[in-house]
């Protein structure tokens, strides 16, 4: 018995720490730091550890299933012709959990309550999956109310009422700072894979994650999840690097809004967009977006037309001249973006983006050749690949 316990302890210690450290805007984030790593023994203990105010390194060494733990709701959801009925579509649609139904009709529905209320992550936390075993099912994570210094690494978040819009968000950032989201997988979510609230998300690095949009219920009626990333915060700096976004159909990502004092800088580097049955980037006002070394394969609309007229500033690096022109402000030659079997890429070289980026050059991560993106990203992004 003692030998078995010791073996388990040693196995956990192999994965007991965060792997690597964040680059980009979340550089310096330490999470639970030197706190003793530990795996919770019950759902109640998991919730307590994630939400309390103590520095912790929390090991997720199994599937923690929240489905059914807070009951279910049976009632009426809104069925919309374009997103729910899906006449002629290739998948089922999504009904809407909401209290109005203009232009639609009410239908009976039943959804799980746990997914509607995320776990509020306290400051100074590292939530780390063990090998490929770390799964949080039926509930998301939220960093808000001034909490900061959080690492979420090597976790699969899945099954948050995927058949319903507003069924749940996987990761929420609202009045937060210094968050590193790394080597996770997100799948089968009702609404957003990652969403910011109206407050600031702060300094965030989203790296090496797999956003898996394959689903039986799609608002795009095509078996691809629509609600991918919605970034709206008041004062946000995003490094988005090495992520694999596949089989999604929209908001991949959407950023910016004129409804708040939103100010967003977004550096997207070496991401792989694959089989996107709608649009990838959708950029609104009050944003500065630098895109380099991203690979778009079978993407209907890599960058929406509205992105060019909504007021945001973009540097899309689509020509040799644009790549070389980075050097004057940034001190390096940008990597161009590549398309394969995809819609047209829009050429924008707003100088304001380079000027903005030059103020924090130390937070701009390096790139590798865009031709290497598909193989490298698929090999590295997601759980169990640390």
Swiss-Prot record:
Keywords: Carbohydrate metabolism, Cell wall biogenesis/degradation, Disulfide bond, Glycoprotein, Lyase, Polysaccharide degradation, Secreted, Signal. The keyword Glycoprotein applies. GO terms for molecular function: pectate lyase activity; pectin lyase activity. SMART domains: Amb_all. Gene3D superfamilies: Single-stranded right-handed beta-helix, Pectin lyase-like. Glycans are attached at residue 124. Residues 1-16 form the signal peptide. Its EC number is 4.2.2.10. It is an enzyme of class 4 (lyase). The active site is at residue 251. GO terms for cellular component: extracellular region. It is found in: Secreted. GO terms for biological process: cell wall organization; pectin catabolic process. It comes from the Eukaryota. Transmembrane segments: none annotated. InterPro entries: Pec_lyase, Pectin_lyas_fold, Pectin_lyase_fold/virulence, PEL. It catalyses: Eliminative cleavage of (1->4)-alpha-D-galacturonan methyl ester to give oligosaccharides with 4-deoxy-6-O-methyl-alpha-D-galact-4-enuronosyl groups at their non-reducing ends. Disulfide bonds join 77-101, 326-334. Pectinolytic enzymes consist of four classes of enzymes: pectin lyase, polygalacturonase, pectin methylesterase and rhamnogalacturonase. Among pectinolytic enzymes, pectin lyase is the most important in depolymerization of pectin, since it cleaves internal glycosidic bonds of highly methylated pectins. Belongs to the polysaccharide lyase 1 family. This is Probable pectin lyase E. It comes from Aspergillus fumigatus (strain CBS 144.89 / FGSC A1163 / CEA10) (Neosartorya fumigata).
């Amino acid at each position: 018995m003692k030998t078995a316990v010791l073996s388990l302890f040693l196995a956990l210690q192999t994965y007991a720490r965060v792997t690597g450290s964040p680059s980009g805007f979340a550089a310096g984030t330490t999470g639970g730091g030197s706190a003793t790593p530990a795996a919770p023994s019950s759902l109640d203990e998991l919730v307590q550890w994630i939400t309390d105010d103590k520095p912790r390194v929390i090991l997720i060494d199994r599937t923690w299933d929240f489905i059914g733990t807070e009951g279910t709701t049976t009632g009426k959801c809104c069925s919309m012709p374009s997103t729910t009925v899906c006449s002629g579509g290739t998948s089922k649609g999504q009904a809407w959990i909401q209290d109005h139904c203009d232009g639609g009709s009410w239908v009976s529905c039943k959804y799980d309550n746990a997914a509607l209320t995320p776990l509020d992550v306290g400051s100074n936390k590292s939530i780390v999956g063990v090998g490929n075993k770390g799964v949080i099912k039926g509930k998301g994570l939220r960093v808000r109310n001034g909490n900061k210094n959080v690492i979420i690494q090597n976790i699969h978040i899945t099954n948050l009422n995927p058949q319903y819009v507003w069924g749940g968000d996987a990761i929420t950032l609202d009045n937060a700072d210094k968050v590193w989201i790394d080597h996770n997988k997100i799948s089968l979510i009702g609404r957003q894979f990652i969403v910011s609230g109206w407050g600031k998300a702060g300094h965030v690095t989203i790296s090496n994650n797999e956003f898996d949009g394959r689903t039986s219920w799609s608002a795009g009626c095509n078996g691809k999840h629509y609600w991918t990333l919605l970034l709206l915060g008041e004062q946000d700096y995003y490094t988005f690097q090495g992520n694999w976004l596949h089989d999604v159909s929209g908001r991949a990502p959407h950023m910016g809004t004129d409804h708040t004092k939103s100010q967003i800088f977004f550096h997207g580097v070496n991401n792989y967009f694959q089989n996107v049955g709608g649009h990838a980037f959708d950029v609104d006002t009050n944003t500065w977006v630098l895109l380099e070394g991203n690979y778009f394969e079978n993407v209907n609309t890599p960058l929406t037309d509205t992105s060019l007229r909504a007021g945001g500033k973009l540097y899309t690096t689509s020509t040799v001249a644009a790549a070389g022109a980075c050097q004057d402000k940034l001190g390096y030659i940008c990597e161009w973006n590549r398309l394969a079997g995809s819609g047209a890429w829009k050429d924008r070289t707003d100088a304001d983006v380079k000027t903005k980026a030059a103020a924090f050059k130390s937070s701009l991560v390096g790139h590798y050749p865009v031709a290497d993106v598909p193989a490298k990203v698929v090999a590295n992004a997601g759980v169990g690949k640390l």
